[in-house]
C-alpha cells in the first residue's frame, strides 16, 4: 500500500514539516505545499527531503489519498473552502488544528460527501520528540478500512494514541492547555512591562523559578497563532482564561486588603479540592525536587540569594481549577508536557507545607512582592480581555512585542528547557 497510497499535507509550518518528515521516513509517499508564493523557497530548501513539494493545495488535494490540513485555526475555514472541493474522490481528510470545532465545521461545509473525515492532534510542539506523547485521533466520519489506514500512518510517531470526539477534544484541550498557556504568557508580559529579565533578579532564581522562566521562554519562542487559536476559538478555553484572570485579581485584592485569613482559607480549600484531603499522595506522577530543578537554570544568581515569592501564578491556577470543578490529574492521558509540568509544580507547592506557608505569608504580610503581583494582575486581565473580544490583532501584537524583548535568551532557554522537560518526563515514565 505504501507504494501507491499518498499522504498530502497542506500547510508547511513547523508541525507540517514534523509530520512530513516522520511519515515519509516511515515509507509513505508524501506531498506537501504551503502558500503558492512560498513554493520556490520550499522547493529549494526541502525538495530533496524525501517528499514531493507541490505548488498549492489544489495539487495536493487532487493527488493525495489522506490530506491533512496543517494551517492556523484562524484560517482553517477559508483554506478548506478554497481547496476542499478539489479533494480526490473517496479520499480521507483531517486536520491538525488545536481547536476542532471550526475545523469540523469547515470540513462539513466544503468537503464532498464521498470524503471521509479523520482528524488528529499531536499534544506537543514541534520541538518535542513525539514518542510516548499523547496523540488524539478523531473519527468524525469514516469506514473501518480508512480508520485502520490512518492509524497505520500515524503509528510512525510512536505516540500514545487517545480516541476522542471533536467535542471531547476541545473540552479536554481547554482543561489542559488554556490556563497553562495563559499563565506563562502573563509572566512574560508582566516581566516585559516591568522591563525585567527575571534571570537577572534574585526574586526569580532557583527551584520552581527555573520552570517558570524556561517554560515562559519556550512559549514565546514559538508561533503566536498556536496559542491564539486555542484561546480565542475554543469557547471552553475562553471561559477558563476568564476564570484564571478572576482568580488572580480576587486573590491579589484579598492579599493587599489585609484579609490574610480569607486568603489562606481560599488557597487551602482550593488545594484540597484539586489534590485531595491527603496531600501525601502524588497524583501528578512528577518527582520534583529542588535539587533536580536547580540543575536547569538560566540565571547566574546563587540560590542562597533568592527572595521569597508569593507564587500568585501558581496559587491562582489551583484556585481557578477549583472554581471550575476541574481535577487536572484526570486528563493526564492526553496532556501536553507543559501541562504535566505545571500540574507537578502546583502540586509540589501544595504538598510542601513550608513552601505553601511562605507563599501565603509573602502575599499577605510581605509587601515587597506586591508591585510584581500587581503587574501580573494587569497582564492577565489584558490577555483575558483580548481573548474575550476575539481580538487576534491585539493578541499578535502583544505576543510579538514580548517575543522580541526576550529573543536574545531563546536559544539558551530552549536548550535548558528541553533538557529539563526530558528529565522530568523521564521520571514520570519510570513511575
Curated annotation (Swiss-Prot):
Kindly report, in one word, the top-level EC class recorded for this enzyme: oxidoreductase
Protein's cellular compartments: Cytoplasm
Look up the EC number in the record and give it: 1.3.1.13
Q: Which reaction does it catalyse?
A: prephenate + NADP(+) = 3-(4-hydroxyphenyl)pyruvate + CO2 + NADPH
Q: Mind telling me which GO cellular component terms the entry cites?
A: cytosol
Which pathway does this chain act in?
Amino-acid biosynthesis; L-tyrosine biosynthesis; (4-hydroxyphenyl)pyruvate from prephenate (NADP(+) route): step 1/1
Ranges for the Prephenate/arogenate dehydrogenase domain?
5-285
The family database entries (Pfam families) matched by this protein are listed as: NAD_binding_2
One GO MF term on file is: prephenate dehydrogenase (NADP+) activity
Q: Which domain of life is it from?
A: Eukaryota
InterPro entries per the UniProt record, alphabetical: 6-PGluconate_DH-like_C_sf, 6PGDH_NADP-bd, NAD(P)-bd_dom_sf, Preph/Arog_dehydrog, Prephen_DH, Prephenate_DH_fun
Report the Gene3D superfamilies cross-referenced here: 6-phosphogluconate dehydrogenase C-terminal like domain, NAD(P)-binding Rossmann-like Domain
Give me any GO biological process, just one.
tyrosine biosynthetic process
- Which family, according to UniProt? Belongs to the prephenate/arogenate dehydrogenase family.
The protein here is known as: Probable prephenate dehydrogenase [NADP(+)]
Q: Which gene is the coding source of this polypeptide chain? A: tyr1
Amino acid at each position: 500500500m505504501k507504494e501507491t497510497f499518498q499522504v498530502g499535507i497542506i500547510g508547511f509550518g513547523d508541525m507540517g514539516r514534523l509530520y512530513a518528515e516522520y511519515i515519509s521516513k516511515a515509507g509513505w509517499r508524501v506531498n506537501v505545499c504551503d502558500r503558492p508564493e512560498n513554493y520556490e523557497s520550499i522547493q529549494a530548501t526541502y525538495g530533496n527531503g524525501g517528499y514531493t513539494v507541490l505548488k498549492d493545495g489544489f495539487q495536493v488535494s487532487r493527488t493525495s489519498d489522506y490530506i491533512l490540513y496543517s494551517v492556523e485555526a484562524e484560517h482553517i475555514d477559508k483554506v478548506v473552502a478554497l481547496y476542499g472541493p478539489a479533494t480526490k474522490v473517496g479520499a480521507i481528510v483531517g486536520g491538525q488544528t488545536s481547536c476542532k470545532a471550526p475545523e469540523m465545521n469547515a470540513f462539513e461545509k466544503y468537503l464532498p460527501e464521498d470524503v471521509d473525515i479523520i482528524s488528529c492532534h499531536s499534544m506537543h510542539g514541534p520541538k518535542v520528540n513525539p514518542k510516548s506523547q499523547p496523540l488524539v485521533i478523531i473519527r468524525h466520519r469514516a469506514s473501518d478500512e480508512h480508520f485502520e489506514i490512518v492509524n497505520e500512518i500515524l503509528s510512525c510517531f510512536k505516540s500514545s494514541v487517545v480516541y476522542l470526539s471533536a467535542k471531547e477534544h476541545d473540552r479536554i484541550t481547554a482543561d489542559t492547555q488554556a490556563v497553562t498557556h495563559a499563565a506563562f504568557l502573563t509572566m512574560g508580559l508582566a516581566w516585559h512591562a516591568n522591563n525585567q529579565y527575571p534571570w537577572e533578579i534574585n526574586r526569580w532564581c532557583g527551584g520552581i523559578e527555573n520552570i517558570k522562566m524556561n517554560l515562559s521562554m519556550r512559549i514565546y519562542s514559538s508561533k503566536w497563532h498556536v496559542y491564539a487559536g486555542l484561546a480565542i476559538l475554543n469557547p471552553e478555553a475562553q471561559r477558563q482564561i476568564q476564570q484564571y484572570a478572576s482568580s488572580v485579581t480576587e486573590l491579589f485584592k484579598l492579599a493587599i486588603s489585609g484579609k490574610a485569613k480569607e486568603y489562606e482559607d481560599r488557597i487551602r480549600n482550593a488545594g484540597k479540592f484539586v489534590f485531595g484531603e491527603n496531600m501525601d499522595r502524588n497524583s501528578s506522577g512528577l518527582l520534583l525536587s529542588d535539587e533536580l530543578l536547580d540543575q536547569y537554570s538560566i540565571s547566574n544568581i546563587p540560590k542562597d540569594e533568592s527572595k521569597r515569592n508569593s507564587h500568585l501564578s501558581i496559587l491562582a491556577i489551583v484556585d481557578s481549577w477549583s472554581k471550575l470543578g476541574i481535577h487536572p490529574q484526570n486528563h493526564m492521558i492526553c496532556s501536553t508536557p507543559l501541562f504535566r509540568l505545571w500540574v507537578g509544580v502546583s502540586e509540589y507547592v501544595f504538598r510542601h507545607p513550608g513552601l505553601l506557608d511562605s507563599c501565603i505569608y509573602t502575599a499577605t504580610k510581605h509587601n515587597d512582592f506586591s508591585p510584581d503581583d500587581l503587574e501580573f494582575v494587569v497582564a492577565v486581565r489584558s490577555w483575558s480581555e483580548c481573548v474575550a473580544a476575539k481580538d487576534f490583532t491585539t493578541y499578535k501584537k502583544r505576543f510579538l512585542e514580548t517575543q522580541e524583548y526576550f529573543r536574545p535568551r531563546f536559544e539558551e532557554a530552549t536548550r535548558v528547557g528541553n533538557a529539563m522537560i526530558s528529565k522530568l518526563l523521564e521520571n514520570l515514565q519510570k513511575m
